[in-house]
Amino acid sequence: MNDKEILEVYNLIKEYHAKYLAQYGVKLPSLKINGRYTRSALVLVYLCRNYPNTAVVSKDELTQFIRQFYPNTTDVQQARHLGAQSGWYISSGTRKDNVSLSLSDSEYHLETLERCYPGFTA
């Protein structure tokens, strides 16, 4: 993804966040801090590509994407944290919290930007 695509997807996320998620305390990660993309924003953007037709994404795929901006990244944990801890409705194969898709242990899927993670409390 190039800078323009990242910004377009992030702006879409911001719109949905303001309309559906902010009221529940779901935190929107900053796109940039000190001129650099944040890892959390990049992971969220990558998971939201082609919304609402989002794809299942592996941890390895996320790590490769983040390495374009942070070359020394060894392991990306942000997808898991954005889900259960921050309220984004991201299913994880490790948590086995998706009943509609069969996800392996190292896969994630953004379910929707219109509802927060089930059971999330800010």
Descriptions of predicted regions:
Residues 109-122:
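Short, amphipathic alpha-helical interaction segments positioned at domain boundaries
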Residues 11-48:
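Short alpha-helical segments that sit at the start of domains
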Residues 53-67:
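Short acidic, hydrophobic short linear motifs in intrinsically disordered regions
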Residues 95-111:
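Minor-groove-contacting beta-hairpin "wing" of winged helix-turn-helix DNA-binding domains
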Residues 88-89:
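Short hinge/loop at the helix->beta-strand junction immediately C-terminal to the helix-turn-helix recognition helix
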Residues 36-37, 55-59, 72-76:
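Alpha-helix N-cap/helix-initiation sites
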Residues 1-8:
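General nucleic-acid-binding
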Residues 70-85, 94-95:
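Short amphipathic alpha-helical interaction segments
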